[in-house]
């Protein structure tokens, strides 16, 4: 695996880019404060925008490490989600992905489009051999 870090990715409808602490309000409003949207992520729903700002501060610091792969997902000028490599198994060159999208953007194919783009990036640029992604039927409930 090549440790190339988080670079911008463009799809037909979306832009994936690094997080900024300035993204805190949108992240909080659009997904981080929603108990349903955050039900399956590794961090709890945020009680206020300060909690989101604190999380983003850590994520932004993490970009100093080229093993960090963590994107904000943008539709036009709006943050609609997040996707990241949450674990790496170097023995088998495997990257595990996790993602979260605001409920307003469920069932429009944005998660599928995002996952495909990130998997292409990981296979082609970072030279990962395998990707693992757990999904749920939460959007269908």
Cite the ranges covered by each PLM segment:
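Conserved GNAT acetyl-CoA-binding A-motif
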Residues: 125-133
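Short, hydrophobic secondary-structure boundary micro-motifs
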Residues: 38-41, 71, 132
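Conserved small/polar residues in nucleotide/adenosyl-binding loops
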Residues: 134-139
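Active-site catalytic microenvironments for nucleophilic, acid-base chemistry
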Residues: 62, 121, 125
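A short, well-structured alpha-helix characteristic of acyl/acetyltransferase catalytic modules
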Residues: 1-54
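Conserved acetyl-CoA-binding loop-helix of GNAT-fold acetyltransferases
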Residues: 107-121
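Acetyl-CoA-dependent GNAT
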Residues: 24, 45-96, 104
